[in-house]
């Protein structure tokens, strides 16, 4: 339990608990990134003035030193639940509803008005939802698994599929890992519908 609690900001939307602000992730630059779905109406009060967002969703970026906050939209994503940074500090954002994942850096500057036209990192083969994601990096896994991408899935499968994510021109592209017979080579999979992984981190 904290010795002292300081209330810094108020006004995060709570219209829809599935869309409310979550997926808190610290970037390599020390900023706190947070995701919010589109079915919300946030009315933040900050030391720098109010920030209003109605039905926009996307990623919030907060500087903990100055308490400045900004927001950028994520076209083609509606209910973002997954945020993870690779070793180079490049963010990958995953939509909870569709499990589509996108590279966030090209989106983090100017605002985009539409919700289409985004190239996703890989074909998720209809898997959904994406509850949390991670780049695998652990001494508990063999060398060939290090750096692979995974997310938790609980509807089309109960488990965590594995993907490659590599440089591809000016962005990233990946693919689901397969066995020699073409079947998915998942990190973990269960036939028990009560097995519902949520946060790979």
List each language-model region with its residue ranges.
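Beta-propeller domains with acidic blade repeats across secreted/periplasmic ectodomains
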Residues: 1-201
């Amino acid at each position: 339990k904290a010795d002292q609690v300081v209330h810094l900001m108020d006004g995060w939307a709570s219209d829809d608990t599935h869309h409310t602000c979550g997926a808190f992730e610290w970037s390599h630059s020390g900023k706190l990134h947070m995701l919010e779905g589109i079915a919300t109406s946030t009315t933040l009060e900050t030391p720098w003035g109010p920030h209003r967002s109605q039905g926009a969703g996307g990623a919030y970026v907060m500087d903990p030193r100055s308490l400045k906050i900004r927001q950028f939209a994520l076209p083609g994503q509606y209910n973002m639940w997954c945020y993870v940074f690779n070793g180079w500090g490049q963010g990958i954002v995953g939509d909870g509803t569709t499990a589509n994942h996108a590279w966030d850096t090209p989106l983090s500057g100017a605002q985009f008005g539409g919700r289409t036209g985004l190239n996703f990192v890989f074909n998720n083969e209809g898997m959904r939802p994406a509850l949390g994601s991670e780049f695998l990096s652990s001494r508990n896994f063999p060398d060939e698994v290090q750096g692979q991408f995974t997310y938790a899935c609980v509807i089309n499968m109960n488990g965590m599929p594995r993907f490659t994510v590599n440089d591809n021109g000016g962005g990233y592209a990946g693919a689901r890992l397969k066995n020699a017979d073409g079947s998915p080579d998942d990190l973990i999979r269960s036939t028990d519908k009560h097995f519902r992984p949520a946060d790979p981190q």
